[in-house]
Amino acid sequence: MANFLKLKQFLTLVLILLALAAKSSKSTPSPSSTTRVKGIYWIENPLFPPSSIDTSLFTHIFYAFVSPNKFTYKLEEEEEDSTTVATSLTTFTNTFKTKTPPIPTLLSIGGATSNSTLFAFIASDPTARATFINSTIQVARTFGFDGIDFDWEFPTTTKEMNDLGELLFQWRRAISDETASTSRPPLLLTAAVYFAVNFFLSGERRMYPVDSINKNLDWVNVMSYDLRGSGSNVTGAPSGMFDSKSNVSVVSGLFSWIRGGVAPEKIVMGMPLYGKSWKLQDPNVHGIGAPNVGPGPGVDGGMAYFQVVDFNKQMGAKVVYDKETGSVYSYSGSTWIGYDDPFTVSVKVGFAQALKLGGYFFWAAGYDTSDWKVSTASKAWRPES
């Protein structure tokens, strides 16, 4: 821990210099609002209803997920005969409207299991695109959401990235037109995006439409996690701040967005409330990069943070803070788990604030401990004058 504390002190000095350099080197105008995003995604879960969320910790809450119909291009919720989905959406928004102050909610469309090919067609076809956009605005307004979040995982070609840029342009125009005709406050428009501004690990090299993002989105939720997955044959930091051997890290990814031209205040850093586990090939070889034979406990090795805490306690696991990656992991026997804890989250939040980013978000509600240990650590974001 002592070495990690030194790392934190070093980071503070370095990040201030980097933040100043980034600010002076970019001409992209920053949003006028000084509000910082402190968000969390909620997944439909009867064991963790929206009312269980500690709203004192968050400024925005996302409903995950809804999807368009592959034949009509309208959100399923607009055509749903059953009242089940409508009740879920209404309960969600009403839960946060009654808070003091009310907490803005966003309807998130897509997700990791959504139909990427369908999104590609919608983005490229003017008729399908208009139908989809109008449906999202209609559903958001009907159920009382304050904004729309788009999670396309992921555009696979340069053309699809260009089409995404046009989709965002038309979406913003439709939101502005709706506001002009109804005198309602404009819906927020955000997008969940890859950890880096460009895709360089596989497939066609392509870059997000930065100009369209700056002009049409309120912010992007950068998924700075899942950097190492169950398919890897060695252990790794799933959301490590650094990687001396590659550009696959939180720091590299966020700086790619800034260097790419996105205004820092439009970049919101994502953090996971879960870890990734592996089964070690040799329990005596247990550092970062140790060979493994496959996923450990959990679905595909995924473990909610509260499950990691329980595992560490029950198994007497050794907890290690790794200064090379700026991450934490634990191991016991053949089980190895990489994750974020309150300390690493406080470091990341300090990093985001030093860079003058737009804020942070967590995936996902219900994964933290019952007393919100990790989420509470995000209070490392200091009040701004």
Swiss-Prot record:
CDD domains: GH18_plant_chitinase_class_V. GO terms for cellular component: extracellular region. GO terms for biological process: carbohydrate metabolic process; chitin catabolic process; nodulation. Residues 36-385 form the GH18 domain. Residues 1-21 form the signal peptide. Keywords: Glycoprotein, Glycosidase, Hydrolase, Nodulation, Signal. GO terms for molecular function: chitin binding; chitinase activity; hydrolase activity. Pfam families: Glyco_hydro_18 (PF00704). Induction: Induced in roots by Nod factors and infection of the microsymbiont Sinorhizobium meliloti. Glycans are attached at residues 115, 134, 233, 247. InterPro entries: Chitinase_II/V-like_cat, Chitinase_insertion_sf, Glyco_hydro18_cat, Glyco_hydro_18_chit_AS, Glycoside_hydrolase_SF, Glycosyl_Hydrlase_18. Belongs to the glycosyl hydrolase 18 family. Chitinase class V subfamily. PANTHER family: CHITINASE (PTHR11177), NOD FACTOR HYDROLASE PROTEIN 1 (PTHR11177:SF396). Symbiotic enzyme that hydrolytically inactivates Nod factors (NFs) with a C16:2 acyl chain produced by the microsymbiont Sinorhizobium meliloti. NFs are lipo-chitooligosaccharide signaling molecules produced by nitrogen-fixing rhizobia to initiate nodulation (symbiosis) on the roots of legumes. Controls NF hydrolysis at the stage of root hair infection. Involved in the regulation of growth and branching of mature nodules. Modulates NF levels and signaling to complete transition of infected nodules to functional nitrogen-fixing organs. This is Nod factor hydrolase protein 1. It comes from Medicago truncatula (Barrel medic).
